[in-house]
């Protein structure tokens, strides 16, 4: 569909040709993705897309990026020196943590970079690497403008914790990397979005704004002045269900902390997932949980570390906790993904249909302005003027459109398409069926 794989596949096509992040699908007009989110991190994927310019490349890249986090995780485990028997269990737990898989269910998103970069930054800090700490901080900030929250939460943790000791000289680098850099970067990002883009997505905090109010400062004011309301807004059924789904896979270990400073790592969970009014923020089927759950994973790891080193629990008990976490995680992961196999089988049994559909869509001239059904937009990503019939021009007629391409069944109201009325407008205004049409695909030409 257009959101999000249609948007990002069209964006990568433009990046492949002129290095811009311009899309027409994201806001129904030609607009750089930088006008919506500051995400230069995407350019790290571009070389691979240039070699293999397929939509599948983006999905494969996302999976590889997310699970590449196992590399810094191995280094962290070696550094904190957990009992050797626990190392393979911790690694196995990471692989079956539901969010690491389910968050990719709606294809590529820049947030996929959060797990490896958060863990690389954590490892750089406990290793007291100066230059690489700055590097991984910048890379983390380049994911998205709100990534500064993850950096600040790490900064607050390392400022008040007593688990790791740092040289006095390194502390200056720590404060520079984890406080000065993210605050300055966020301020710059907000300025650029306000001046040249769509502005910050404050609408996702509408539940924290009074009538007539707008802006992040108003959100902060209301949070400070109305803490009980904010606290109450967290205890909705869906949010509590979300909390269960992100904590239960770790046997609630993130909550078992002797060091209160560790709870700073939960800051993004509240600011990015629970406080927002956008329902997908607290749904593990979407990409907004990558960063928060990576920090929860670190909290679980730190919990095991303190329980082991302070001899508050025997190694056998901790091994049992990790084993149970793997079982819980695997069960939740299976419940969310077992039907994915059906979709693969569905494609394989109808491969001729999908191959024919792809051939039909590729035959549409690239220089035409195309209005398409959302499911067709990834295949039409090479078109510079590509729009989704579901929301283009508020579903009104647009005379600038050259070609309309939709499933043939969309013509019939009985099939339940909300776009049927829009399609009818184009037919009534003189758009005729093209000889490019097939029995499954209806193509109208001006």
Q: What kind of region is each of these model predictions?
A:
Residues 72-75, 93-96, 111-137, 158-161:
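Specific aromatic-rich, kink-prone transmembrane helix
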Residues 230, 240-263, 270:
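Hydrophobic, aromatic-rich transmembrane alpha-helices
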Residues 85, 176-183, 307-337:
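Signature aromatic-anchored transmembrane alpha helix within multi-pass, membrane-resident enzymes
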Residues 56, 60-81, 120-123:
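Transmembrane-helix motifs of polytopic, lipid-linked glycan transferases
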């Amino acid at each position: 569909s257009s959101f999000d794989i249609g948007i990002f596949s069209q964006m990568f096509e433009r990046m492949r040709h002129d290095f811009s992040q311009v899309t027409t699908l994201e806001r129904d007009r030609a607009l750089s993705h930088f006008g919506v989110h500051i995400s230069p991190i995407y350019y790290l994927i571009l070389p691979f897309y240039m070699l293999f310019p397929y939509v599948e490349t983006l999905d494969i890249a996302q999976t590889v990026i997310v699970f590449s986090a196992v590399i810094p995780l191995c280094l962290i485990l070696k550094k904190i020196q957990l009992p050797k028997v626990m190392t393979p269990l911790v690694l196995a737990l990471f692989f079956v943590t539901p969010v690491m898989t389910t968050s990719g269910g709606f294809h590529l998103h820049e947030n996929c970079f959060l797990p490896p970069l958060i863990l690389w930054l954590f490892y750089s800090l406990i290793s007291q690497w100066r230059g690489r700490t700055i590097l991984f901080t910048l890379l983390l900030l380049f994911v998205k403008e709100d990534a500064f929250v993850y950096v600040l939460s790490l900064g607050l943790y390392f400022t008040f914790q007593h688990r790791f000791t740092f040289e006095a000289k390194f502390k200056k680098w720590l404060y520079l990397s984890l406080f000065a850099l993210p605050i300055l970067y966020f301020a710059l990002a907000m300025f650029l979005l306000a001046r040249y883009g769509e502005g910050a997505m404050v609408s996702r905090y509408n539940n924290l704004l009074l009538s007539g109010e707008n802006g992040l400062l108003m959100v902060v004011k209301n949070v400070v002045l109305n803490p009980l309301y904010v606290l109450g807004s967290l205890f909705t059924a869906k949010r509590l269900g979300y909390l269960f789904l992100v904590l239960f896979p770790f046997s609630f270990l993130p909550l078992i902390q002797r060091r209160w400073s560790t709870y700073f790592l939960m800051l993004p969970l509240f600011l990015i997932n629970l406080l927002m009014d956008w329902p997908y923020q607290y749904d593990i089927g979407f990409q907004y949980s990558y960063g928060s759950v990576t920090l929860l994973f670190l909290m679980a790891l730190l919990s095991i570390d303190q329980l082991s080193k302070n001899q508050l629990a025997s190694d056998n008990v901790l091994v049992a906790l990790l084993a149970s976490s793997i079982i819980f995680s695997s069960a939740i992961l299976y419940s969310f993904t077992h039907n994915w196999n059906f979709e693969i089988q569905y494609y394989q049994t109808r491969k001729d249909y999908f191959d024919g559909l792809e051939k039909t869509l590729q035959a549409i001239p690239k220089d035409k302005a195309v209005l398409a059904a959302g499911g067709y937009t990834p295949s039409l990503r090479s078109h510079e003027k590509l729009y989704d019939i579901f929301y283009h021009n508020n579903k009104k007629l647009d005379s600038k459109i050259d070609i309309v391409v939709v499933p043939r069944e969309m013509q019939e109201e009985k099939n339940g398409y909300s776009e049927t009325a829009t399609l009818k407008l184009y037919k009534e205004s003189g758009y005729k069926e093209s000889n490019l049409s097939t029995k499954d695909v209806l193509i109208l030409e001006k």
